[in-house]
Amino acid sequence: MISAGVDSSDLAKRGESLIRQSSNRYLTTVRIAFRAKQRRFDDFDGLLEESSVKPVQRAIVELSDEQDQPDLLPG
């Protein structure tokens, strides 16, 4: 999913895509922040492997993947 580091230009493109395709920039920002907070606590609980990727970066990548490939979502 995410390699040891995230390419900053790719991350910027993903973030711009999330904002551009949203109807409400504020809610998109809140979704990213909420997902990042969840990932940070998952890291503290030891549920995820040690990662050099910051929670906000991981949240942007995950939400971007969910937006671009909705058929990958469970359910």
UniProtKB/Swiss-Prot annotation:
Source taxon at top rank: Bacteria
Top-level EC class: transferase
GO terms classed as biological process: DNA-templated transcription
One Gene Ontology CC term in the entry: DNA-directed RNA polymerase complex
UniProt-listed Enzyme Commission number(s): 2.7.7.6
Reactions it catalyzes: RNA(n) + a ribonucleoside 5'-triphosphate = RNA(n+1) + diphosphate
InterPro entries recorded: DNA-dir_RNA_pol_omega, Pol_omega/Rpo6/RPB6
Gene Ontology molecular function terms on file: DNA binding; DNA-directed RNA polymerase activity
Keyword field: DNA-directed RNA polymerase, Nucleotidyltransferase, Transcription, Transferase
Keyword Protein transport: no
The UniProt record lists the keyword Thylakoid: no
Job of this protein: Promotes RNA polymerase assembly. Latches the N- and C-terminal regions of the beta' subunit thereby facilitating its interaction with the beta and alpha subunits.
Subunit structure, as described in the record: In cyanobacteria the RNAP catalytic core is composed of 2 alpha, 1 beta, 1 beta', 1 gamma and 1 omega subunit. When a sigma factor is associated with the core the holoenzyme is formed, which can initiate transcription.
Family: Belongs to the RNA polymerase subunit omega family.
Protein name: DNA-directed RNA polymerase subunit omega
Organism lineage string: Bacteria, Bacillati, Cyanobacteriota, Cyanophyceae, Synechococcales
